[in-house]
């Protein structure tokens, strides 16, 4: 999963189309096919009481991002499988909860990503730093377009650096 953080969760995915397609399950028919997945990002999920007892307590540290991947790790360790079933439909307004607070949501994403890399992938600081620099450059580019990114830059740096220091 360390490899995926760089190859598929950054713009490097453009150079690895086969791996990217497989990672995101694009070889499946999302409208008709039930298939096993590692995690479903941005999902509404259901599990049995037995499964809930096996995978709880949930990690409360990440906020808005990475929770599904952490749950996937817990499910795998406990011997449970995660499946995508197209017959299960939940209407979710993507981005409505974060649309008005883009810089805040981005900051939460980066802090949760650093935490996930450190605690669950056991990445060393020299693995995390390039990813952090990449995300920070993207933050800088977003400042050009979005006023809230300009306004929130101090908070982004303070929170992300605090999370990053915990990796050292």
Give short role names for the model-derived ranges.
Residues 2-37:
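Short, flexible, basic/aromatic active-site loop/helix in glycosyltransferases
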Residues 30-33, 38-57, 61-89:
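A short, conserved alpha-helix in the catalytic core of glycosyltransferases
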Residues 54-55, 93, 116:
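Residues that scaffold the ATP/ADP-binding catalytic core of kinase and kinase-like folds
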Residues 91-111:
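Nucleotide-sugar-dependent glycosyltransferase catalytic core
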Residues 104-112, 122-168:
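Non-catalytic, C-terminal membrane-associated alpha-helical segments of glycosyltransferases
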């Amino acid at each position: 999963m360390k490899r995926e953080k760089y190859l598929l969760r950054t713009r490097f995915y453009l150079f690895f189309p086969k791996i990217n397609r497989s990672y995101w399950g694009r070889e499946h028919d999302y409208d008709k096919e039930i298939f096993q997945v590692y995690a479903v990002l941005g999902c509404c999920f259901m599990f049995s009481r037995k499964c809930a007892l096996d995978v709880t307590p949930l990690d409360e540290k990440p906020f808005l991002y990475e929770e599904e991947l952490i749950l996937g790790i817990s499910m795998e360790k406990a011997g449970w499988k995660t499946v995508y079933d197209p017959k299960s439909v939940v209407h979710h307004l993507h981005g409505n909860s974060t649309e008005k607070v883009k810089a805040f949501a981005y900051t939460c994403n980066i802090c949760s990503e650093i935490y996930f890399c450190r605690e669950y992938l056991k990445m060393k600081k020299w693995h995390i730093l390039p990813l952090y620099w990449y995300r920070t450059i993207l933050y800088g580019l977003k400042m050009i377009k979005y006023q809230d990114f300009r306004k929130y830059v101090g908070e982004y740096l303070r929170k992300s650096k605090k999370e990053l220091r915990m990796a050292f």
